[in-house]
Swiss-Prot record:
Name recorded for this polypeptide: Voltage-gated potassium channel regulatory subunit KCNF1
A biological-process GO annotation: regulation of potassium ion transport
Pfam families linked: BTB_2, Ion_trans
Intramembrane segments: 358-378
Protein function: Regulatory alpha-subunit of the voltage-gated potassium (Kv) channel which, when coassembled with KCNB1 or KCNB2, can modulate their expression and their gating kinetics by acting on deactivation upon repolarization and inactivation during maintained depolarization. Accelerates inactivation but has relatively little effect on deactivation. Coexpression with KCNB1 or KCNB2 markedly slows inactivation.
UniProt membrane topology term: Multi-pass membrane protein
Similarity comment: family membership: Belongs to the potassium channel family. F (TC 1.A.1.2) subfamily. Kv5.1/KCNF1 sub-subfamily.
Cell location: Cell membrane
Transmembrane segments: 184-204, 224-244, 250-270, 290-310, 325-345, 386-406
Keyword terms, alphabetized: Cell membrane, Ion channel, Ion transport, Membrane, Potassium, Potassium channel, Potassium transport, Transmembrane, Transmembrane helix, Transport, Voltage-gated channel
Organism of origin: Homo sapiens (Human)
Topological domain ranges for the Cytoplasmic compartment: 1-183, 245-249, 311-324, 407-494
One Gene Ontology CC term in the entry: voltage-gated potassium channel complex
Description of how the protein assembles with itself and partners: Heterotetramer with KCNB1 or KCNB2.
């Protein structure tokens, strides 16, 4: 102990037995001073703070391998780290677990825990979920950046056919890559609308004509327009298929299955009509053709390829399966109960419209969904009361899952916008680093610190003001592991 009676650290290089569990450890993290005790830190001897207890025995080399600076006069260790995250990390010594405060980036907090050598197993489960979500976002950003770099890069070792495939794939799948690609995307979008309008107009009796057998068929002009649209869709699908990097994954993806369903009925109908005319079975073939024509409505789903809003809505519905399942179950129970009550209460009326409970299902469905066609309605007082209650229950049942579905839609839509912005920002940073050489960034990384020359032997203990080190932090997260390689690729693609 010193003259004031306080417990303190021994001088660096000494082998005093005072470096024990009852000494004080004074740390200054980002300007925030904290006094810790050895008996508290020794609970987890593998952590960085616990290593400070006996670090003075190894001299200044050991001290500066653990901290950024050390003031021998104040016996104070300095760390250029986040003080808010540090306050959360030291909770492990008091409570045996770590909780991450709101407003701290989960990835940055994970890096702080790695710096202080606190295992992630001490992080509470609620905080681990935030960390996992942020990791997934960074992986998605890295994937998007990698895709953009792959589109920009041209490998000289690739053959001409492979380079042609990549150009066609980029031309069809990346409308923002060039002005002609954007024009083709707009043209495809307009043709989808035209084909859908033609399909609807073909059912108008005034626009139909009589064939040789006296049957009403679509006007030849509408058929020609539809044939042209189908030809474009077929060409587009084949080009996508031949230029796709993974043809099996391409063929099994949802949007490409929709493309097949949009064009397949046309060719099947054409084939059946031709074969039916030759086999004198035109009546049966026409029935098959009419059944296949209904599949043409699948082409409207092709709009989802050109609409991020429709894709977001699809994702929101997929994430809301639980809420939608609860809605259907609630409606099913209500339909069964109110249809049975309605049938029972209406049996006293001589002109009842409720002939059976299964027939009453229809009335319960249109009542609970607030449609109310009026083809079946109650005539007794109890039946009308039952109808009013079923109506109110239907309104409540339909309104309950709306809020979670909207939340899922807004959350996913905002997340996609953030990921797109982050990917573009990452590319801008990589381009800036490549133009500046990537080695002269302000505030060096950990690799910059590792390349610093070691302290000369026999040098006097530096003070807090005399020892200057690069200010650094681990808050920068490289999204791609081979950052220098990607910077080089980006520079070569200019």
């Amino acid at each position: 102990m010193d003259g004031s009676g306080e417990r303190s650290l021994p001088e660096p290089g000494s082998q005093s037995s005072a470096a024990s569990d009852d000494i004080e450890i004074v740390v200054n993290v980002g300007g925030v001073r904290q006094v810790l005790y050895g008996d508290l830190l020794s609970q987890y001897p593998e952590t960085r703070l616990a290593e400070l207890i006996n670090c003075l025995a190894g001299g200044y080399d050991t001290i500066f391998s653990l901290c950024d600076d050390y003031d021998p006069g104040k016996r104070e260790f300095y760390f250029d780290r986040d003080p808010d995250a540090f306050k959360c990390v030291i909770e492990v010594y008091y409570f045996g677990e770590v909780h991450m405060k709101k407003g701290i980036c989960p990835i940055c907090f994970k890096n702080e825990m790695d710096f202080w050598k606190v295992d992630l197993k001490f992080l509470d489960d609620c905080c681990k979920s935030h960390l996992s979500e942020k990791r997934e976002e960074l992986e998605e950003i890295a994937r998007r950046v990698q895709l953009i770099l792959d589109d920009l890069g041209v490998d000289a070792a690739e053959g001409r056919w492979r380079r042609c495939q990549k150009c066609v794939w980029k031309f069809l799948e990346k409308p923002e890559s060039s002005c002609p690609a954007r024009v083709v995307a707009v043209l495809s979008f307009l043709l989808i609308l035209v084909s859908s309008v033609v399909m609807c107009m073909g059912t108008i009796p005034e626009l139909q004509v009589l064939d040789a057998e006296g049957n009403r068929v679509e006007h030849p002009t509408l058929e020609n327009v539809e044939t042209a649209c189908i030809g474009w869709f077929t060409l587009e699908y084949l080009l996508r298929l031949f230029s796709s990097p993974n043809k099996l994954h391409f063929a099994l993806s949802f949007m490409n299955i929709v493309d097949v369903l949009a064009i397949l009925p046309f060719y099947v109908s054409l084939t059946l009509t031709h074969l039916g005319a030759r086999m004198m079975e035109l009546t049966n073939v026409q029935q098959a053709v009419q059944a296949l024509r209904i599949m043409r409505i699948a082409r409207i789903f092709k709009l989802a390829r050109h609409s991020s809003g429709l894709q977001t809505l699809t994702y929101a519905l997929k994430r809301s399966f639980k809420e939608l399942g609860l809605l259907l179950m609630y409606l099913a129970v209500g339909i069964f109960v109110f249809s049975a009550l309605g049938y029972t209460m209406e049996q006293s009326h001589p002109e009842t419209l409720f002939k059976s409970i299964p027939q009453s299902f229809w009335w319960a469905i249109i009542t609970m969904t607030t449609v109310g066609y009026g083809d079946i309605y109650p005539k007794t007082t109890l039946g009308k009361l039952n109808a009013a209650i079923s109506f109110l229950c239907g309104v409540i049942a339909i309104a309950l899952p709306i809020h979670p579905i909207i939340n899922n839609f807004v959350r996913y839509y905002n997340k996609q916008r953030v990921l797109e912005t982050a990917a573009k920002h990452e590319l801008e940073l990589m381009e800036l680093n490549s133009s500046s050489g990537g080695e002269g960034k302000t505030g060096g990384s950990r690799s910059d610190l590792d390349n610093l020359p070691p302290e000369p032997a026999g040098k006097e203990a530096p003070s807090c003001s005399s020892r200057l080190k690069l200010s650094h932090s681990d808050t920068f997260i490289p999204l791609l592991t081979e950052e220098k390689h990607h910077r080089t690729r980006l520079q070569s693609c200019k």
